[in-house]
Every structure is written in structure tokens, then in C-alpha cells.
Regions:
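Bacterial N-terminal signal peptides that target proteins for export
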Residues: 5-23
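Bacterial N-terminal signal peptides
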Residues: 22-32
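Short, low-complexity N-terminal intrinsically disordered segments enriched in polar/charged residues
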Residues: 37-67, 184-199
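Short beta-strand edge/turn micro-motifs at domain boundaries
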Residues: 38-39, 128-129, 143, 147-195, ...
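Short solvent-exposed beta->alpha transition segments
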Residues: 41-49, 55-56, 71-140, 224-254
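Alpha-helical segment of the N-proximal tetratricopeptide repeat
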Residues: 196-215
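TPR/TPR-like (Sel1-like) alpha-helical repeat modules
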Residues: 213-229
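Intrinsically disordered, low-complexity segments enriched in Gly and acidic/Ser/Thr residues
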Residues: 236-324
């Protein structure tokens, strides 16, 4: 059992805090509609000089991240994002130790021509769409990038191999005065509890076939998290994964799980527990991933009272859906009361009764 109080505004949960900070630091969301920008060139269709320049720039950025060279990375970032670098500095500091000793391999590069994008009447940058056909096939990789200023862009995926756990470092780049500079940074692990995204996808399919809808739904979440390089990327394969997940989704969460649509679970004592979020987490690095459950708490209590409530909530969750006991290490309960710091407690499955 592990307990901690979360710092409000720093990390909403262990699972998505790093990702959110990185994107918030480097991409500004816009409310305008998406602008069509069809000019996408995949690496197989690029001129060798263009491919080499983009790959070299991405490898250089990845090397700076690996070395924890925040100053160097800031110097290689477009001006409008370099001036407010606190978020990305935090992400680099959290990520760099996990990359030590790894080999950097440029996996994919794309050229995205956003030179025809138009700013809104208020000067805001539009959302942009790029549709990339892969190797003259029916498969596509699509980019829907929010708040993208007009310009010439590239997207690069650099894998870090040979570490205890492999990582993916994805970069959005923009050409400034003939040089590629960073305009977005998206680090994600390539494995969780020792398994990659394809493994979780296959396991989710098997769970769905066994009518283990809750397990399948959560494992599909883990698969997507490991396979998607950045939140604004969609692909033919990811669409297939999402379609499979939708067909396996339990009816109780067909509209998702949120503050407006909580999952209500009744405990053995008749008490109701309202979960406002349900996902997965691998922060402990165990042999199985954990469930991450956000619990609405009306009245905040002291640590002992919150721990007791969280234990009861975890028991109610596994009591309602006992299939979850098999493929998960444990359950994180993040107790959240309005105006208070979240309080997170992890219970191994063997502790939950």
C-alpha cells in the first residue's frame, strides 16, 4: 500500500501529468475549426537531403533530452515557446534518467507543409489537418494539430532502445531560417509492466472474447497509450483499435467516465462510491499494471479517514467487477474533494477485500 498527497496543478495523476505538461508547454489550443493542409510527405517519398536533415535535427534534440541538456534544448526551440520553458524543463527532468545508456534510433519522419494555413481574424493560429498516405497503400497517418502557426513543419519519432524500458521521443519541428527547431515534444514509454502496445492489444482481444469487458476496456486503453506517439495523431491501425475497444466497452461506461457521468458502484455495506475517472497506470513498475480510479469525495477528511474511505472504494470496485483481480497488480484510488489537493493511495489486489 502506498499513499501520497498530490500537488494540485502539477500532476493531476501519475499517468498523464508528464504528457499534459509537455503539450501545454509547447502547443497552444485554439478554438477555431481545422484548416485543411493536405501536403504531407512520408520518409519513403522524401528527397534524401530532406529526410537526412529532419532525421539529424530530431536525433540532436533527442540527444539533448537524453543528456538532460535543458539549456541546449531551449536554444533549439522556436522563440514563442522557448520564452516559457518551465513545463518542458520539468518533462525533460522526469524523462532523462530513464533514457541513460540508450541508443537513439530515428523511427519515422514526416514533412508537413503548413505554409498555406491562415490565421483567424483575431490573429489566432488555426487547427491544422495533414493526411499522410503510407507507402502508396490504403493505410494513413493523420495529424490534427491544434493552434498551428503557418509554416513548414516536420514530425519525427525517435526510439530509445537498450534501456531497462524502451521509450519513444516524438518531436514537432518547424523550419526557421533554414534550420529545424522544436515546436512540440511528446515523450511516451513503449512498454508497461514489461509488455508493448501490441501485446496489450492482443490481450484485450482475448479478454473481449472471454466476455471480460472491463479488463478488455482497460487493456485497450493501455495499448492505445503505448501505440499513439502524440494525442493529435490518428492512424488506420489506431482507428481499428478504437473500434474494437468501443465494441468491448461495458454498457455502464458507454458514455465514458467523468464528473458529469460518474461510474456509481455500491459497496457491500450499501454505501455508494462515485468514480469520475477510470484508467491504467504503470508508475510503480510492477509485473502487472495498476488500475487508476478517481473518486469523488464530498467532505475531505484527515489522512486516516481518507485512507479508510479509499480502501472501501477499492473493495467496492473489485467487488462489483471481480474479473479485475486477475490482470492487474492493484488499484490506485485518487480521492478528490472540491478545493482540496487530491489524495492518492495504492492498494495491491491482495490487500483489497
Amino acid at each position: 500500500m502506498r499513499t501520497r498527497t498530490e500537488r494540485r496543478g502539477k500532476m493531476g495523476t501519475m499517468m498523464d501529468g508528464m504528457k499534459r505538461l509537455g503539450m501545454a508547454a509547447l502547443l497552444m489550443l485554439a478554438v477555431s475549426g481545422p484548416a485543411r493542409a493536405d501536403d504531407c510527405i512520408t520518409q519513403s517519398a522524401m528527397k534524401p537531403a530532406d529526410r537526412d536533415a529532419l532525421a539529424t535535427a530530431a536525433r540532436g534534440l533527442a540527444a539533448k533530452v537524453q543528456a538532460g541538456d535543458v539549456a541546449g534544448l531551449r536554444g533549439a526551440t522556436v522563440a514563442e515557446y522557448a520564452k516559457d520553458f518551465g513545463g518542458i524543463e520539468y518533462v525533460v527532468g522526469s524523462t532523462a534518467p530513464k533514457l541513460k545508456g540508450g541508443t537513439l534510433v530515428v523511427e519515422q519522419v514526416y514533412l508537413l507543409d503548413g505554409s498555406q494555413l491562415k490565421r483567424g481574424a483575431d490573429g489566432s493560429a488555426p487547427d491544422a489537418q495533414f493526411f499522410c498516405t503510407l507507402n502508396h497503400s490504403m493505410a494513413e497517418a493523420d495529424f490534427l494539430i491544434p493552434g498551428l502557426a503557418p509554416g513548414s513543419y516536420g514530425f519525427a519519432i525517435v526510439n530509445v532502445e537498450g534501456t531497462a524500458s524502451p521509450w519513444r521521443l516524438s518531436f514537432l519541428l518547424r523550419k526557421e531560417q533554414g534550420q529545424w527547431q522544436m515546436a512540440g515534444f511528446y515523450p511516451t514509454p513503449l512498454s508497461a509492466a514489461g509488455h508493448d502496445g501490441i501485446w496489450y492489444w492482443k490481450e484485450a482481444r482475448a479478454m473481449a472474447a472471454r466476455k471480460e469487458q472491463w479488463n478488455a476496456w482497460l487493456y485497450y486503453q493501455q495499448a492505445e497509450s503505448l501505440l499513439r506517439p502524440a494525442n493529435f495523431i490518428q492512424s488506420t491501425h489506431l482507428e481499428k483499435l478504437k473500434a474494437e475497444q468501443a465494441s468491448a466497452t461495458p454498457p455502464a461506461v458507454s458514455d465514458g467516465v467523468s464528473k458529469d457521468a460518474p461510474l456509481v458502484v455500491k459497496g457491500a455495506d450499501g454505501a455508494e462510491y462515485r468514480f469520475t475517472g477510470l484508467g491504467v497506470d504503470d508508475s510503480l513498475g510492477k509485473d502487472k499494471i495498476d488500475i487508476m480510479a478517481h473518486l469523488k469525495v464530498d467532505q475531505p477528511g484527515d489522512a486516516a479517514a481518507t485512507h479508510k474511505l479509499s480502501a472501501s472504494a477499492a473493495g467496492a470496485l473489485l467487488g462489483a467487477y471481480p474479473e479485475m483481480r486477475r490482470p492487474f497488480h492493484g488499484v490506485w484510488i485518487v480521492a478528490e474533494a472540491a478545493g482540496q489537493n487530491p489524495f492518492a493511495t495504492e492498494f495491491s489486489v491482495s490487500e483489497i477485500h
